[in-house]
Amino acid sequence: MAKPAAAARPRRRERKNITSGVAHVNATFNNTMITITDAQGNTISWSSAGMQGFKGSRKSTPYAAQVAAEDAGRKASEHGMRTLEVEVKGPGAGRESALRALQAVGFQITSIRDVTPIPHNGCRPRKRRRV
């Protein structure tokens, strides 16, 4: 006979007390992902436009990036985070709006870096779209 399933107790997230961190904004043509880490690179919170309920081409809009950045920022501020360095990667539409949303949540932004990878004539690019 099968044993009754033990009541799975929800694991309480321990509240870390981290005052400064790094916000990694990855803005692609299809989505915008925001990950907030501590100085060592350990993830504190993350969010994306798709996680916020945007589907299809609406994920790539600046508004979707703003909502995702507000969500990730709110989660990180629960851990006591106050100051952020921002690293922006990619060519997407949500770069600036995600940055403004992080400021609106109440973070003090100390530096902004563009870490978009640029090839020194590496792989052959995709063919041009003809619309």
Curated annotation (Swiss-Prot):
The keyword Ligase does not apply. It comes from the Bacteria. InterPro entries: Ribosomal_uS11, Ribosomal_uS11_bac-type, Ribosomal_uS11_CS, Ribosomal_uS11_sf. This is Small ribosomal subunit protein uS11. GO terms for biological process: translation. Pfam families: Ribosomal_S11. One of its GO terms (cellular component) is ribosome. It comes from Paramagnetospirillum magneticum (strain ATCC 700264 / AMB-1). SUPFAM superfamilies: Translational machinery components (SSF53137). Part of the 30S ribosomal subunit. Interacts with proteins S7 and S18. Binds to IF-3. Keywords: Ribonucleoprotein, Ribosomal protein, RNA-binding, rRNA-binding. The keyword RNA-binding applies. One of its GO terms (molecular function) is rRNA binding. Located on the platform of the 30S subunit, it bridges several disparate RNA helices of the 16S rRNA. Forms part of the Shine-Dalgarno cleft in the 70S ribosome. Belongs to the universal ribosomal protein uS11 family. Coiled coil: none annotated.
